[in-house]
Structures are given as C-alpha cells and as structure tokens.
C-alpha cells in the first residue's frame, strides 16, 4: 500500500467517530513534513484533529526527513511538484527547509521555538508571507525549569545548563540566569556542538560539581534521548527537559507544552487556510497548556527523594 493511501486510511480511522459534511468539491491535498522520525502518537493526534475538522477523506502526504538534511531538501522539492493546498511543518528544520525553498505554498508550523529570530515570520502578530503556526514556548520557560529543579531538589546551589546554539536557546539561557540570580543559584553553562560533544558535556558538568542540569533538547539530541538519560544517570545528574518522551525514556522530569494542544491548534490554523484565509492574516500562537512529568524510577536510581508536595503538582508520575 502506498504511504499516501495508508495515511488516508489512518485519517479516516482517527476520525471515524465523527460525521463530516458532504461536499462535491475536489478533496484538498494536505502535506505534512517532519524533519526526523515522527512520533506515532503525535501523528495520530494531528490526524484526529484534522478529522474532527472534517478532513477525514482528504489526500494527505506525510513525508519524513529521517534526520537527513539532504533527504529533507528532496522532500521539499516533492511538495513543490505535488502542490498541496497547505503544508504542516513539524519541527524547526522542516519549517526552515520550506522557508528556504520559497514554494509559495501556505505553511503552518509546529514545535518551532523562535520563528521570528529564525526569519520564518516577521512577527508573531503579523507573520507576513506564507507562514504561520504555533511556536513551541516563550523564552521565560527557562526560568520555570530552574524553579522546578529548586523545588524538587533540596539544597541545590549549582545547576548545569546544556544547550545547543540557537537564538531560542540563548534567550532561554538568559531567562535561567535571571532566575538563578534571584535564587542564589550558580549556573554552569555548556554549549553542545553536536552529538559527538554530548558525553564530554556531561563530564564537564560533573567536574563543575553541578547538582542538576537543564537540558535544552534540539532535534538531534531528541533522537538520542535514551543516551542522554543514560549519561545523566551515569553522572548522577538529575535533569529537566522539554518533552514527555524524554522522561518516558529515562530522564528525571520534563516541563513543556502538550503535543495535543499544539497539534489541535495547528490543525485549526490549517483549516482556516483551507477555507480561504491567508497565513499572513493569522497571528503565530503560543501554547497555553503545559505539563509536568516526573520519572520516579529514575529519581530512585539517582538516590533522590522528591518531596510529596512536588509530586502532587505533577500531571503524571512514572513509577
């Protein structure tokens, strides 16, 4: 079965519980571009959201870059030939690749941390051009990560921040520094040059006597989240991350937007475009729903006792 046919069936299955308005118009074609390996649960959430909006019998092309920039560029060119009515770009590299291609096709992006700084849109209120979407989070989330570590780990005075170079990461690092200054927390900052730099970054954090770490995940590191969790455990370093999956794969905790809210809002923006709106007329949105996930098994492996009052704040505790 061809991938497009399979995706159409999945959309229909996800939307099967709802009735869709009859239409004699030609089915619109929707493109979905992911730079890496899309999470099955996330894709299902997106299909479900599109199904609820009436796109249960729509041609959908789901293309995955599988972490290969050359492949990603080739897939963008395929969209140029197929000419979908709208493309949903999942992850920053996917959005950038589409921006650089100048296809003149409306794009709705998801999980992009700094769309203005990256030049994808001119501003949040007035995106301009063919792009709009849902940004991942504001810079202030960095301060929230530090706050959660302070509340979870008694007597903590030194925190490592492991980050990949991007304007979004730099803004979050400044938010962390500001929060740390008010709490008397010392920050050890370590920029990651790439996957080959990961182990040495944890070594440096341990030598700096960090008692915990904030790990700013990029697309490459997210694909190696189990390795990140293993390195953190090896170095006895509690870590906080952005994504639920990082905690499910062994890291201590995460705080970030929920996939379902982001993807529902992305689907809603795509629906508006399919109904005639221009991306430039649709302000870029921020998520409003965040979740705290804690891996208690990892806490025990680290010899860490999480206060009961903190556990009660969690949206999910993995035993």
What are these regions (language model features)?
Residues 1-319:
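Short hydrophobic alpha-helices and adjacent helix-cap/hinge residues
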């Amino acid at each position: 079965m061809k991938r497009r046919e399979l995706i159409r069936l999945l959309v229909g299955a996800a939307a099967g519980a709802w009735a869709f308005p009859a239409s004699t118009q030609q089915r619109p074609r929707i493109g979905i571009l992911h730079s890496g390996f899309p999470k099955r649960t996330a894709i299902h959430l997106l299909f479900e959201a599109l199904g609820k909006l009436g796109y249960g019998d729509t041609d959908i092309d789901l293309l995955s870059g599988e972490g290969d920039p050359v492949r990603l560029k080739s897939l963008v060119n395929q969209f140029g030939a197929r000419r979908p009515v709208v493309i949903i770009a999942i992850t920053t590299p996917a959005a950038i690749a589409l921006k650089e291609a100048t296809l003149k096709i409306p794009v709705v992006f998801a999980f992009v941390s700094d769309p203005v700084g990256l030049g994808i849109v001119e501003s949040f209120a007035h995106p301009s051009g063919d792009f709009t979407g849902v940004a991942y989070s504001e810079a202030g989330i960095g301060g929230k990560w530090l706050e959660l570590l302070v509340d979870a780990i008694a007597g903590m005075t030194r925190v490592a921040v492991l980050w990949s170079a991007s304007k979004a990461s730099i803004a979050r690092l400044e938010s962390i520094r500001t929060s740390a200054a008010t709490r008397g927390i010392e920050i050890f900052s370590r920029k990651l040059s790439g996957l080959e730099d990961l182990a040495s970054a944890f070594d440096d954090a341990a030598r700096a006597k960090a008692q915990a770490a904030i790990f700013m995940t990029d697309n490459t590191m997210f694909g190696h989240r189990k390795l990140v969790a293993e390195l953190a455990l090896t170095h006895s370093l509690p870590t906080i991350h952005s994504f639920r999956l990082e905690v499910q794969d062994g890291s201590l905790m995460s705080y970030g937007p929920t996939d379902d809210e982001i993807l529902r809002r992305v689907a809603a923006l795509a629906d508006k475009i399919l109904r005639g709106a221009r991306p430039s007329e649709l302000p870029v949105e921020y998520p409003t729903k965040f979740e705290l996930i804690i891996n208690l098994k990892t806490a025990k492996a680290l010899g860490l006792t999480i206060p009961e009052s903190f556990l009660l704040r969690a949206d999910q505790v993995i035993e």
